[in-house]
Amino acid sequence: MSHQSELQLENKLIKQLIGLNYAAVQIQDGDALVSNLKSQLEVFNQITFTAKEFDAILNHLSKGNVFEKAKTLRDRFQLTKEDGTSFYVRFFNTEDTSQNLYQVTNQISLEGSYKNRYDVTLLVNGLPLVQIELKRSGLEIKEAFNQINRYQKHSFWSNDGLFQYVQLFV
């Protein structure tokens, strides 16, 4: 029986997710993650945000602990647009999940206290909600747990803390 490398396993997983209607997207770093979030939220909410408006959204998303962030996903954010009108930004459609935008990316590098690179990340409406840490055969599962703990400690808070929205580790 041959063993798959982590890269082979990663590519196979991504291919399966694409078959489940996830869009593959290349996100190299935190700046690209934020840029992708803006474009996905614009498509999802059917609106274009100015830089100032999107900064207000990022500020809102950066607040709270992990439990408050889970609540933020389900709530709407009242954004005061530059023209003075209000718009309610949605982050997740809980009533009809088929309306959400699903993406898969791999090898995102974030730099906090240390530089970390994440194996496979699932994004919903641009927010990273699932983190998958792959390990080749022969390594103990404990290695993946240790790695996720390092990520949480060293870089999940970087780039507006978007990785603090991760709801599930696999």
Language model: regions and residue ranges:
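An alpha-helical interface "stripe"
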Residues: 1-170
